[in-house]
């Protein structure tokens, strides 16, 4: 009964929000421009508040560094495996290495973990996200632009990263957390004000993200088989490499059930949603969008599995 209640209270809101997004598009209440505006609002305003609050509440230690290095290693290993497999698997996508690595933490990971574990445990997903952010905003995007012919000078790339509100939120959160200012504010009026502002501004983030994802969900029968093979290939690679390195990580650091939940959630997430933007052709962009839609559906399904096994992990 408790498991069914958890599924209903944590998965049903997600499914309904996705359905609302789909219906908004079907009945022309929302168009592509509107969805772009929603995504801009989320990524530049509400999501940075979620991320800042998560990062500044982390209790940073050597274990934090080990987790970040583990996640970075997972991303790099999957990336290298993608380039190796690309030589043998030529009928899926030219962007195969980029479909196998990277995780959509911002637009999907943070909102799902918030529903799964609550605001007080968001520090766990922040620790996991640190290594992933380093990978995506440096190696992943640099190589993706290079692969797709979107040239950009190093100074331009650095400026773009520094000006990104998500990165600013991460850096500010790290600054407040690492210096101990976050601990000093805990339980004080200043801490309550910061948490209150962050909580209020970030409140609509999950719903807005899910509306936009629901609008973008596309299942094209022509591309279904190829997209399904790519999704299953990613899941197999992530299970092998991500699962193995996660097991190794917890041999090196004390067991933390919510950190394990955060790691597992990251591993079931789809590739970064930015991928279609850099596709070389409309056909490739169409396939990548289909792949991400299918990957998102698998992520929701596996998220439901996480909800079921959460009592066994947390105890």
Predicted region positions:
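Alpha-helical transmembrane segments of multi-pass small-molecule/ion transporters
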Residues: 1-315
């Amino acid at each position: 009964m408790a498991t069914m209640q958890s599924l209903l209270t944590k998965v049903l809101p997600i499914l309904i929000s996705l359905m609302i997004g789909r219906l908004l598009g079907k009945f022309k209440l929302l168009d592509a421009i509107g969805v772009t505006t929603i995504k801009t609002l989320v990524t530049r305003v509400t999501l940075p508040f979620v991320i800042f609050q998560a990062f500044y509440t982390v209790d940073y230690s050597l274990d934090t560094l080990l987790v970040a290095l583990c996640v970075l290693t997972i991303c790099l290993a999957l990336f290298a495996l993608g380039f190796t497999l690309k030589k043998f698997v030529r009928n899926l996508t030219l962007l195969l290495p980029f479909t196998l690595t990277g995780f959509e933490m911002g637009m999907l990971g943070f909102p799902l973990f918030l529903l799964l574990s609550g605001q007080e445990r968001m520090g766990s997903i922040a620790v996991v996200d640190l290594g992933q952010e380093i990978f995506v905003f440096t190696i992943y995007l640099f190589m993706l632009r290079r692969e797709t012919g979107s040239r950009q000078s190093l100074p331009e790339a650095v400026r773009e990263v520094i000006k990104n509100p998500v990165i600013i939120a991460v850096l500010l959160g790290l600054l407040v957390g690492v210096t101990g200012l976050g601990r000093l504010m805990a339980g004080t009026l200043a801490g309550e004000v910061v948490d209150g502002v962050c909580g209020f501004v970030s409140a609509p983030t999950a719903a807005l993200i899910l509306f936009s994802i629901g609008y973008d969900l596309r299942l094209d029968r022509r591309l279904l088989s190829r997209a399904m093979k790519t999704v299953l290939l990613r899941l197999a690679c992530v299970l092998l490499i991500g699962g193995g390195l996660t097991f190794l990580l917890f041999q090196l650091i004390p067991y933390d059930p919510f950190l394990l939940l955060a790691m597992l959630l990251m591993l079931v997430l789809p590739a970064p949603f930015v991928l279609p933007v850099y596709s070389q052709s409309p056909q490739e962009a169409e396939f990548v969008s289909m792949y991400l839609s299918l990957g998102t559906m698998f992520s929701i399904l596996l998220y439901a599995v996480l909800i079921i096994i959460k009592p066994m992990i947390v105890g």
